[in-house]
């Protein structure tokens, strides 16, 4: 796995492009803080997107049922695996680290059609 630091000047473009490639992914958000320890904010929820708002100086991680805001982000690191981005780590102005882990949503098998041929007779 390779890790890359993303320069702040590229955050908006990087997250816009990343969000387009994350359709169908699920995310887990962990907040690591010296004061509070490690807390899981969200567990494998459908990911809508990640965006950087330069005007308000925040990163928004939008999940199906949660909007997670990171105020005053200072550093962004991305972990790349074989299939692309597997995690994003963001350090905020208070020294907390927010880790977004990504995975593909589970694919369910197609419904069985065993009984459908009998009902059409």
Predicted regions, residues:
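A short, Trp-centered hydrophobic/proline-enriched beta-strand micro-motif
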Residues: 23-32
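Short coil-to-beta-strand transition motifs
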Residues: 36-46
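Helix-rich interaction surfaces within compact, conserved domain-sized segments
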Residues: 72-121
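A structural micro-motif recognizing beta-strand termini
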Residues: 32-34, 64
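Acidic, aromatic-enriched beta-alpha/helix-loop junctions
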Residues: 44-92
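N-terminal leader/targeting segments and the immediate start of mature chains
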Residues: 2-23
């Amino acid at each position: 796995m390779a890790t890359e630091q993303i320069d702040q000047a590229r955050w908006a473009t990087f997250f816009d492009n990343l969000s387009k490639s994350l359709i169908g992914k699920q995310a887990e958000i962990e907040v690591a803080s010296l004061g509070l320890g490690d807390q899981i904010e969200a567990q494998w929820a459908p990911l809508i997107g990640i965006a950087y708002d330069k005007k308000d100086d925040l990163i928004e991680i939008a999940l199906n049922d949660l909007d997670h805001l990171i105020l005053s982000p200072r550093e962004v690191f991305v972990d790349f695996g074989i299939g692309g981005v597997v995690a994003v780590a963001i350090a905020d102005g208070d020294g907390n680290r927010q880790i977004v882990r990504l995975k593909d949503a589970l694919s369910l098998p197609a419904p069985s059609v065993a009984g459908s041929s009998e009902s059409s007779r």
